Amino acid sequence: MERVLIVNADDFGLSKGQNYGIVEAYRNGVVTSTTALVNGEAIDHAAQLSRELPALGVGMHFVLTLGKPVSEMPGLTRDGLLGKWIWQMAEEDTLPLDEIAHELACQYQRFIDVFGREPTHLDSHHHVHMFPQIFPIVARFAAQRGIALRIDRQTVLNADDLPSDLRSTQGFSSEFYGEEITEACFLRILDASAHRGEASLEVMCHPAFVDNIIRQSAYCYPRLTELEVLTSASLKAAIAERGYRPGSFLDI
């Protein structure tokens, strides 16, 4: 059975170092897709690079935890900025869902304005779209526009009223992250997916060159390690040997 593998690099537009790392991992490695933060400091640079790479799938990385929102969000921001306090608000069930739905639409339009096309799919920074309160909003939005959505199926296993026409990969992994960033780890992810009989798989990654913006991230130098692994010739060969076809969210 042919299996589609989407290797999606998050954080396109975060910084020039991030952008260049993603492009390097696409041109000379196994990355096939990326998702862009439309409020990132280097989003215009990302759009410029993407125009030189028309085959690179570019989706939208919905942001509710970093930087300035595109719309006014007095219920979620502090001093005009987004932040990780969204987790506490989710636990307390005090999320301003109307604001979040409006911000999603505004970021989507911002993506179209910057990239000149619709995104291939949606996911989110720090996986906030998987919050139980937020997921139905994003799922309906994606289904209405006919675009795919990153789904951690174990997280939404008992979710009600999912749109029947919502597109996603059968499998998703965020395990290629943190301390264990190795070729062996990547291949274990593929083998586990194949064992489950999944016909499509998304593997999340964050390859980057380190610059001043990336240095401010709690997840900094591992991005360089990711880049090294993802551009390994032996990894590309091992993926092909396992029968995976590189693809984007337009292929599912």
Curated annotation (Swiss-Prot):
Single GO biological process annotation from the record: polysaccharide catabolic process
Originating organism: Salmonella paratyphi A (strain AKU_12601)
EC nos: 3.5.1.105
Enzyme kind, highest EC tier: hydrolase
Family, as annotated: Belongs to the YdjC deacetylase family. ChbG subfamily.
Signal peptide: none
Reactions catalysed according to its record: N,N'-diacetylchitobiose + H2O = N-acetyl-beta-D-glucosaminyl-(1->4)-D-glucosamine + acetate; diacetylchitobiose-6'-phosphate + H2O = N'-monoacetylchitobiose-6'-phosphate + acetate
Parts of the chain that traverse the membrane: none
Record: residues binding Mg(2+): H61, H125
Cofactor requirement: Mg(2+)
The keyword Magnesium is annotated on this UniProt entry: yes
GO-annotated molecular function: chitin disaccharide deacetylase activity; deacetylase activity; metal ion binding
NCBIfam families: PRK02134.1 (NF002559)
Protein name: Chitooligosaccharide deacetylase
Pathway assignment: Glycan degradation; chitin degradation
Subunit: Homodimer.
Keyword Magnesium part of the UniProt annotation: yes
